[in-house]
């Protein structure tokens, strides 16, 4: 079973990897995410919910300004945080991304990860958005496998990463202060998740398909 605080830490790590954030932005975002879960009925310490629902980015967008306003930062810093964090979260509630992240008729985890599904990101041009989508998908896959894995049985599911160099590009994971190496952090996060699931022996196969393997990270 995945503890809700463990899930939140993974989610914040994904945002920190994919969005340029500096100073206390990750801490403010984490505080807002935790409050969103509490508003949805979650007991964070016990990892229990009396309603069995999860907050959406709409819920996060509602609490972010309040969390920033309650902080002890200067007015200029608060204004910067509202502009940076709220604008980015709002972009996940509009257009096609709103349909992906906030749809009420979304596929269940069982349908997404146990059935025959193709996730086509070929038309997502922005690297930050593509990294965020893949990061959340891999996080959901990892948590789903950790909760439903059957050890040492027959092969049950195959996950294929086509043109894997777009996700596992050979690059440095180092970053300088107050900047984010989007590709490096995303590669590191994805590789660690795949490695963890492989070690867990959950009867799943991960196949990397790429015409140029020399461009892949090790």
Q: Predicted regions span which residues?
A:
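P-loop NTPase motor domains
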Residues: 1-217
